Amino acid sequence: MSLGSLAFTLFLTVVAGIKCNGTEVCAGSPGIPGTPGNHGLPGRDGRDGIKGDPGPPGPMGPPGGMPGLPGRDGLPGAPGAPGEHGDKGEPGERGLPGFPAYLDEELQTASYEIKHQILQTMGVLSLQGSMLSVGDKVFSTNGQSVNFDTIREMCTRAGGHIAAPRNPEENEAIASITKKYNTYPYLGVIEGQTPGDFHYLDGASVNYTNWYPGEPRGRGKEKCVEMYTDGKWNDKGCLQYRLAICEF
């Protein structure tokens, strides 16, 4: 069918569906609904409404967390200015009366006599070879032979220390007692952690030595020091029995 014939057929179909009344007003049948149009542009905002009444109170919220720990103390402040001098105190109580002058003289006399007796005793002991005085030191022995720790304890109990010569004069005094008893004594000198490093019992470094040639050679195994009768030193173990000589 040609395009013109198709158009004519559709025209007849439409005309056939039209009804006319006596006044020449024709009413056609409803056509097929068209496709929906596109959405229009948004309208303008309306005016604000009237303010509403306040709402009811809300429920109580949960309690907050626990209190935190106290903070650290702050730094000390600067020292304050010195205060004013206080008032003078009341006089103290009267002291005890002093000794009469004659008693003071008697005390001086007694002190002199005691010193004289001590010097006499020291002289007797020196003649016996059991005690010698050199400078401000006194070297003494009781003639016993014991190990190093026992000698140290004996001397400490007597208020002294194991004899430790710090110069040739003191070394000779100890050697004199050694010859008298013909027994080697221990000296107040010991070896430290480092082999060959010797020091006095108070920790001070040794400032005087009189080693026998080739000594010390214990190399850390002989911690104590003994003296020969000629005054020479030798490193030795500390468990031997040696003459106890103390210094005061």
From Swiss-Prot:
Q: Which GO terms describe its cellular component?
A: collagen trimer; collagen-containing extracellular matrix; extracellular region
How this chain assembles, per its entry, is: Oligomeric complex of 6 set of homotrimers.
Cystine bridges: which residues? C155-C246, C224-C238
Additional record remark: Pulmonary surfactant consists of 90% lipid and 10% protein. There are 4 surfactant-associated proteins: 2 collagenous, carbohydrate-binding glycoproteins (SP-A and SP-D) and 2 small hydrophobic proteins (SP-B and SP-C).
Domain (Collagen-like): give its ranges: 28-100
Which ranges carry the C-type lectin domain? 132-248
To which species is this protein native? Mus musculus
- Stretches of Basic and acidic residues bias are at 42-51, 84-93
A Pfam family name for this chain?
Lectin_C
Known function:
In presence of calcium ions, it binds to surfactant phospholipids and contributes to lower the surface tension at the air-liquid interface in the alveoli of the mammalian lung and is essential for normal respiration. Enhances the expression of MYO18A/SP-R210 on alveolar macrophages.
- Subcellular compartments: Secreted; Secreted, Extracellular space, Extracellular matrix; Secreted, Extracellular space, Surface film
Question: Could you confirm whether the keyword Signal appears in this record?
Answer: yes
Positions glycosylated per UniProt: N21, N207
Map out region (Disordered) in residue numbers: 28-100
What's the superkingdom here?
Answer: Eukaryota
Which protein are we looking at?
Pulmonary surfactant-associated protein A
GO MF terms held by the record = carbohydrate binding; metal ion binding
Q: Does the keyword Glycoprotein apply?
A: yes
Q: Which residues of the sequence carry a binding annotation for Ca(2+)?
A: E215, R217, N234, D235
Keyword annotations of the record: Calcium, Collagen, Disulfide bond, Extracellular matrix, Gaseous exchange, Glycoprotein, Hydroxylation, Lectin, Metal-binding, Repeat, Secreted, Signal, Surface film
Instruction: Return the Pro residues bias intervals.
Output: 54-65
Tell me the first and last residues of the signal peptide. 1-20
Residue numbers carrying 4-hydroxyproline = P30, P33, P36, P42, P54, P57, P63, P67, P70, P76
**A Gene Ontology BP annotation from the UniProt entry:** respiratory gaseous exchange by respiratory system
